[in-house]
Amino acid sequence: MLQTSSSSATASLQQQLSKQYANSFSNDGSSFSSKNNQQYSEIVNYISFNQDASCITIGLKNGYKIFNCQPNFGRSFQFKNDESTGIVEMLYCTSLLATVAQGEEIGSSPRKLKIINTKTKSTICDLIFPSTILQVKLTNTRLIVVLEDQIYLYDITTMKLLHTIETSPNLSGLSAISYDDSNSYLAYPSPPKTITHDSLLASGINTNGGSNSTQNNISSVSNTPNRVGDVIIFNLTSLQPISVIEAHKSTIASMAFSNNGLYLATASDKGTIVRIFEVATGTKLYQFRRGTYPTKIYSLRFSADDKYVLATSSSLTVHIFRLGEEEALETKHKKKKIPAVATILEEETEGSQSNEQTKSIKRNSEEFEDIRDDGDDSDVDDEDGDIDDESLEVIPAKQRKLSQGSTNSYTSVNSEDVQSNSPKTEPLIDQNRLSMARIIRRSSQTLGRKAAQKMGDFLPSRFSSILEPTRNFASLKINAHSKDTKSVAVMNNVLQQDLIPQTYLASDNASAKQDFMEVSLFHIYVVTTEGMLYTYGLDPERGGDCILLNSHCILDEY
């Protein structure tokens, strides 16, 4: 809830925040200048957060850097040399570090993994692999090295090779690791071929991952040829595959485990749908629509409390999806009520199928094609990029139906109680993003949404969920110079008191009684390949547009 602050003790802080806020959106002489961003984007090879999101690692053309980002921002380690670093990964906040060179210089190789002690600045060991190292992950017990067609598993305490997994070509080295000691898993894309009964039984894999899975479950996979969107779950403790999750029908682009290792988030190369599965059973718990137009998902990450999922994309936005009771009920409602043809159509928005299936879908669901395109111009080439359909016009909470509340995802899980005590339940709106393109698009989308709601009152319930897809709870726009900027994001679960300018939210500046407001926010940290660290604030009760709190150029000398 927003509160105004008039204490004289905060005057200096307010002045500092005002200056910082103004600089954040300046195009001249600030850390966001085009010249600086172009320069930094050319030297950043790799960006990553460590396992608990307390540190940032940056791979550079001339070495690497490590920064603390929680509780306070600051550089903790820097190594400079003439070798370009392609991968740099930490083991939590310990002195153990894994690095891989780009191989651009004479004598360096992208096939060599170095395990380094940052305290002594010494190399513990070197490991040479048969092909280029694409990804490296560290847990308390395992070292995982991903190549294009192999995954190597080591005991991190002895550096002994425990197991080697032969995989289908994995050009990006896509994988996900669960860091929980009780649920230590590895996820990687399944081979894009028909899986037979014999191969499943021989390797101990079943489609549901449960001990009571039936032969019908296996045949459901084996009867689906050339699947490329399946994910294999591998137990890092027993060194055995335990299940196959049918995540998408097109190629997997990104995935991430929850912090407790119980859930897996996935997105395909289409970039329109984000799904959350239960690892133990393979059951789909949540399904969110990020947008209608295709985009590249760079990363998925659960919040520290596993109640939110963050998705960064090539549209320079970060979407935050809430894993609440309403969203779970909405996904369950869709699963039960949507007819088979609609389910197929939902899958078809992500990938392509055979000509026969495509023709069948067009014949049976032609009338639904327009309403399935829900109007999220998330990747339209304008300055605003992704927006929420309802972010600028909100229906009073008491008039919302369950499906609509889940669709907008703007109320808290216990929204009824919160709304009864506070009139300010509408989502936050960033006045700085109110461009003409966004206003026009909002008008057309709101009209479409109202029409869908009216139609939903007259149509059977199985069609209403088609008209109202589950959307993100909040989003933010990255103020990047280049459209090719990549980003990763994390979110903590500690509410912090922040002062933000009243003009950030007030549409009428004259009506603002105070210059600043005190807001309770979750902090979201976003690192980009332009060498910037952004801190945004998320209102957990209202959602909507996240608030830019501060920024740091992490490549500047200190």
From Swiss-Prot:
Q: Which InterPro entries match?
A: PROPPIN, WD40/YVTN_repeat-like_dom_sf, WD40_repeat_dom_sf, WD40_rpt
Q: Does the keyword Transport apply?
A: yes
Ranges annotated as biased composition (Polar residues): 402-424
What are the WD repeat spans here?
247-287, 292-331
> Which SMART domains does the UniProt entry name for this protein?
WD40
Cross-referenced PROSITE patterns: WD_REPEATS_REGION (PS50294)
The keyword Cytoplasm belongs to this UniProt entry's keyword annotation: no
Q: Which domain of life is it from?
A: Eukaryota
This entry's Gene Ontology molecular function terms read: phosphatidylinositol-3,5-bisphosphate binding; phosphatidylinositol-3-phosphate binding; phosphatidylinositol-4-phosphate binding; protein-macromolecule adaptor activity; ubiquitin binding
Motif range (L/FRRG motif): 288-292
Q: Name one GO biological process term.
A: DNA damage response
Cellular compartments annotated: Preautophagosomal structure membrane; Vacuole membrane; Endosome membrane
Q: Where is the composition biased (Acidic residues)?
A: 367-392
Main subcellular localisation: membrane
**Keywords for the protein's UniProt record, in alphabetical order:** Autophagy, Endosome, Membrane, Protein transport, Repeat, Transport, Vacuole, WD repeat
| GO cellular component terms, A-Z | cytosol; endosome membrane; fungal-type vacuole membrane; PAS complex; phagophore; phagophore assembly site membrane
Q: Where is this region: Disordered?
A: 344-426
**Pfam families, A to Z:** PROPPIN
- What does the protein in this record do? The PI(3,5)P2 regulatory complex regulates both the synthesis and turnover of phosphatidylinositol 3,5-bisphosphate (PtdIns(3,5)P2). Necessary for proper vacuole morphology. Plays an important role in osmotically-induced vacuole fragmentation. Required for cytoplasm to vacuole transport (Cvt) vesicle formation, pexophagy and starvation-induced autophagy. Involved in correct ATG9 trafficking to the pre-autophagosomal structure. Might also be involved in premeiotic DNA replication.
Family affiliation = Belongs to the WD repeat PROPPIN family.
Free-text comment about domains: The N-terminus might form a beta-propeller domain involved in specific binding to phosphatidylinositol 3,5-bisphosphate (PIP2), leading to the association of the protein to the membrane. The L/FRRG motif is essential for the cytoplasm to vacuole transport (Cvt) pathway, for the recruitment of ATG8 and ATG16 to the PAS in nutrient-rich medium, and for its recruitment to and dissociation from the PAS under starvation conditions.
Q: How does it assemble?
A: Component of the PI(3,5)P2 regulatory complex.
- What name does the UniProt record give this protein? Autophagy-related protein 18
Q: What organism, scientifically named, is this protein from?
A: Candida albicans (strain SC5314 / ATCC MYA-2876) (Yeast)
